[in-house]
Amino acid sequence: MSTAVQVDDVMRYRDSRFQTIAAKLLPTQYLVVDDDTALTTTLGSCVAACLRDPVLKIGGMNHFLLPKGQVGDGAPTRYGSYAMELLINDMLKRGAHRKRIEAKVFGGANVLKGFTSNPVGTRNAEFVRQYLQAEHIPIIAEDLCGIHPRKVWFFATTGRVVVQRLPHAHEAEVAATESAVRARLSKAPVTGGVELFE
């Protein structure tokens, strides 16, 4: 059974490429599934972590915009630190074992103009690597940084990931979408909480 536990509903559609139902995650969203749903997202400087318990065959994906933020700084799910906790905790609630969780991480492209000295994409990529290392969750595959936006499909039951690097023509569109979400979220009130599991 697939359920979105975030306030915003995740859009589902029939993916003709893979002949399955796909759930499209937007920035700040995450989803955990235990069926054949393809989790998909489009990434520029944002990062998506795909986590999986290979024994239980459940997994999830998140999509975050920035590594860390301050409490009271708008929607907390835009920050990797919060988005990672939500994803891990949801998997643990569904029976995943922390020691079996493995990760595949994607995104962190440097597509936002004006961030040349400390690019958001690079910071996001560094954050997700450091976070997973600190949590003792191995990264078994990654496609991070670079200059190209990506579209990612993750199949939790098998662990398969398909990454399509998008041509330069998509950079402006992806960057504009990410910037618009950042602007909207900077005005959003803080909601929700995190329950930590040891």
Swiss-Prot record:
Its EC number is 3.5.1.44. GO terms for molecular function: protein-glutamine glutaminase activity. Keywords: Chemotaxis, Hydrolase. CDD domains: CheD. SUPFAM superfamilies: CNF1/YfiH-like putative cysteine hydrolases. It comes from the Bacteria. It catalyses: L-glutaminyl-[protein] + H2O = L-glutamyl-[protein] + NH4(+). Signal peptide: none annotated. GO terms for biological process: chemotaxis. It is an enzyme of class 3 (hydrolase). HAMAP family: CheD. Probably deamidates glutamine residues to glutamate on methyl-accepting chemotaxis receptors (MCPs), playing an important role in chemotaxis. Belongs to the CheD family. This is Probable chemoreceptor glutamine deamidase CheD. It comes from Xanthomonas euvesicatoria pv. vesicatoria (strain 85-10). The gene is cheD.
